[in-house]
Amino acid sequence: QAKSQGGSN
């Protein structure tokens, strides 16, 4: 299981 982290602005 992989953790993904992202954001938008």
Curated annotation (Swiss-Prot):
The modification Pyrrolidone carboxylic acid is found at residue 1. Keywords: Pyrrolidone carboxylic acid. It comes from the Eukaryota. The biological source(s) and physiological activities of this peptide have not been determined. This is Thymic factor. It comes from Sus scrofa (Pig).
